[in-house]
């Protein structure tokens, strides 16, 4: 007979390669705090329900706390032959308290146990990510307030489009992160039902109190269907989906920082703390932190795709395939945590090059829309006609190699005879930015109000 905890049915133990492919302790030991929390709630409920005698409950509780202390102290020996964190904890518990440890698994399966552990871990991690995203929002809002008047080019198709302010650009990411945090909280709310007590898949014949264990572990309620309880990994998928969208936002910002810090743009300067040098080129200051944020977004998205593919073909309820939920989820959410921390540090330290930004804001005929708007407002032209007139003037200026503001009034009047000297007032980038006073626009006063509102909201 096999000496495994599940080995009564087997005449011999598993092959060595079976042990290797089956073991998850190398990565699921991360679930130790959650596993012990779940076991403490479970054994307390078993005692209150009269399923276990008080002396066994007390011994098991004391033993679990001893195991927890060993793990926290780094003295706990994790063994591959014990497969996973559940068997590892129970094996050590047996060594500490003896046969009473075997009663802990009454009315419980590893199926509902691991689902509970994973939900607790994902919930804890979502809470942490929410706080990290808020930290990045604060850094961005502070930077936005400081640079509400710093004019820069706004881009479409990575071509100069209209002037905006650096503060306005920062606030765009504050808004994205607000949606990310909303998704973290939505995912948390949906996962907050306890699968503990669903057992293998059909529930249990013991008179357990699932509402009690749910409350003890901070869940809103127990799950309503035992099959779904152990088959569900939606909570991990939702967390990974939310993480992936957040990672996309961080990657877009990271890409901008990589471009903006190049000598060709020179829009911003990152501190030495977030750049590295070259082993051969002494002049280099490489934006490695931003590049790694950009790269790790691919890893995070890959974890979501991987788990979707694992889950798509599984019949109810539990299959060993679901063991593959952990490494990708752990890695992706840890990677996002690292990216949020790195991006927060970069934002706090970076400084925009205001002179370069202002010059760039005036290039590429970025005030052409302001000219078209002036033609509509002051001369009453339909916008499409104003667009056409402005396009002609851009063509003239481009042929001469000058900006719109350098065209003479007679040259302007060749395209539209009613144009007056007053038109030149709208061709400066500062005036252009100041005129964008619509709600959500880039006018500096708007930016200051929005930045201050976010700073107050974030605390």
UniProtKB/Swiss-Prot annotation:
Q: What Gene3D superfamilies does the record tag this protein with?
A: Fumarase/aspartase (C-terminal domain), Fumarase/aspartase (Central domain), Fumarase/aspartase (N-terminal domain)
Give an example GO molecular function.
argininosuccinate lyase activity
Keyword Amino-acid biosynthesis tagged = yes
A GO BP entry: arginine biosynthetic process via ornithine
Query: Known catalysed reaction(s)?
Result: 2-(N(omega)-L-arginino)succinate = fumarate + L-arginine
* Gene Ontology CC: cytosol
- Pathway in which the depicted protein is active: Amino-acid biosynthesis; L-arginine biosynthesis; L-arginine from L-ornithine and carbamoyl phosphate: step 3/3
Q: Mind telling me which InterPro entries this protein's record contains?
A: Arg_succ_lyase_C, Argininosuccinate_lyase, Fumarase/histidase_N, Fumarate_lyase_CS, Fumarate_lyase_fam, Fumarate_lyase_N, L-Aspartase-like
Cross-referenced SUPFAM superfamilies: L-aspartase-like
Q: Which CDD domains match?
A: Argininosuccinate_lyase
Presence of the UniProt keyword Oxidoreductase in the record: no
Q: Which domain of life is it from?
A: Bacteria
Q: Which UniProt keywords apply?
A: Amino-acid biosynthesis, Arginine biosynthesis, Cytoplasm, Lyase
Where does this protein reside within or beyond the cell? Answer: Cytoplasm
For this protein, the record's Pfam families field holds: ASL_C2, Lyase_1
> Where primarily located?
cytoplasm
Q: What general EC class does the enzyme of this chain belong to? A: lyase
- The EC designation for this entry is 4.3.2.1
Tell me which family the UniProt entry assigns to this protein: Belongs to the lyase 1 family. Argininosuccinate lyase subfamily.
HAMAP family listed in its UniProt record = Arg_succ_lyase (MF_00006)
UniProt name for this protein: Argininosuccinate lyase
Q: What organism is recorded for this protein?
A: Methylobacterium radiotolerans (strain ATCC 27329 / DSM 1819 / JCM 2831 / NBRC 15690 / NCIMB 10815 / 0-1)
């Amino acid at each position: 007979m096999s000496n495994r905890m599940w080995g009564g049915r087997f005449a011999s133990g598993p092959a060595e390669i079976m042990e290797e492919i089956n073991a998850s302790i190398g990565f699921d030991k991360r679930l130790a705090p959650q596993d012990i929390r779940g076991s403490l709630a479970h054994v307390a409920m078993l005692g209150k329900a009269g399923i276990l005698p008080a002396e066994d409950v007390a011994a098991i509780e004391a033993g679990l706390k001893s195991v927890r202390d060993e793990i926290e102290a780094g003295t706990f020996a994790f063994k591959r032959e014990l497969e996973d964190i559940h068997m590892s904890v129970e094996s050590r518990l047996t060594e500490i308290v003896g046969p009473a440890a075997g009663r802990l698994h009454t009315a419980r399966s590893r199926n509902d146990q691991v689902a509970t552990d994973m939900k607790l871990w994902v919930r804890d991690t979502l809470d942490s990510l929410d706080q990290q995203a808020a930290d990045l929002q604060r850094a961005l809002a502070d930077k936005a307030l400081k640079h509400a008047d710093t004019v820069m080019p706004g881009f479409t198709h990575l071509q100069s489009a209209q002037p905006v302010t650096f503060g306005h650009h920062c606030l765009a990411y504050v808004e994205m992160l607000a949606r990310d945090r909303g998704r973290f909280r939505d995912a948390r709310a949906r996962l907050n039902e306890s699968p503990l007590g669903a057992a293998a898949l059909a529930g249990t014949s013991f008179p357990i109190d699932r509402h009690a264990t749910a409350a003890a572990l901070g869940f809103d309620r127990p799950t309503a269907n035992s099959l779904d309880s152990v088959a569900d990994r939606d909570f991990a998928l939702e967390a990974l989906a939310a993480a992936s969208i957040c990672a996309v936002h961080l990657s877009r910002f990271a890409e901008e920082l990589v471009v903006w810090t190049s000598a060709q743009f020179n829009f911003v300067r990152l501190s030495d703390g977030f750049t590295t040098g070259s082993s051969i080129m002494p002049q280099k200051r490489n934006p490695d932190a931003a590049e790694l944020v950009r790269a790790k977004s691919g890893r995070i998205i890959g974890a979501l795709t991987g788990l979707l593919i694992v889950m798509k073909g599984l019949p109810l309820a539990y299959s060993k395939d679901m063991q593959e939920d952990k490494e990708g989820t752990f890695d992706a959410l840890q990677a996002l945590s690292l990216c949020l921390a790195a991006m927060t540090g970069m934002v706090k330290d970076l400084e925009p090059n205001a002179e370069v930004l202002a010059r760039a804001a005036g290039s590429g005929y970025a005030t052409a829309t302001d000219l078209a708007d002036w033609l509509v407002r002051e001369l009453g032209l339909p916008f499409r006609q104003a667009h056409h007139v402005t396009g002609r003037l851009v063509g003239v200026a481009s042929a001469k190699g000058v900006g719109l503001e350098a065209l003479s009034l007679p040259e302007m009047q060749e395209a539209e005879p009613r144009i007056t000297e007053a038109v030149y007032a709208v061709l400066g980038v500062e005036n252009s930015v100041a005129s964008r006073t619509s709600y959500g626009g880039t006018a500096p006063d708007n930016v200051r109000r929005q930045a201050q509102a976010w700073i107050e909201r974030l605390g």
